[in-house]
Amino acid sequence: MLAEALASHLESPLGRGHVPEDACTGAAGGAACGDLVRISLALDPGSPEGRIADAGFDASGCGAAMAAGSATVGLLRGATILEAARIGADEIAQELGGLIPSKRHAAELASDALHRALGSAARTRARLAMVGGRTIVAMSGGVDSA
């Protein structure tokens, strides 16, 4: 029997097929299981803390992958980049009311896709935050042998 939360995400997926304007997208999946989850998110440009303004997903494969994408979008609503970075497979599985071990990979795929989208968003935000054309570069490493 499906958990009520999982069934709800399957019946009415949140943000399925929606790609926000100026979206940063991350995808995860593979040939091993045939599942693919793509998470897209857009940042609020007026938000100093990097609040997520909109999110959507697309998924193919098993129903658990679809539900995990939907649950991820639900968890992203109103979150900042930092809060979203704390969302992992455990939080996604919990949002679905738990997943059996053979379906846990769906939450892991959604988490991986989310973190790839967040990486893209962080890079975009860093480019937008450049002030005065100055760039500071920090380097570490050994002594130049030349």
What are the residue ranges of the model-derived segments?
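Short beta-strand elements
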Residues: 35-45
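Short, well-ordered strand-loop elements centered on a beta-strand within folded domains, enriched
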Residues: 47-59
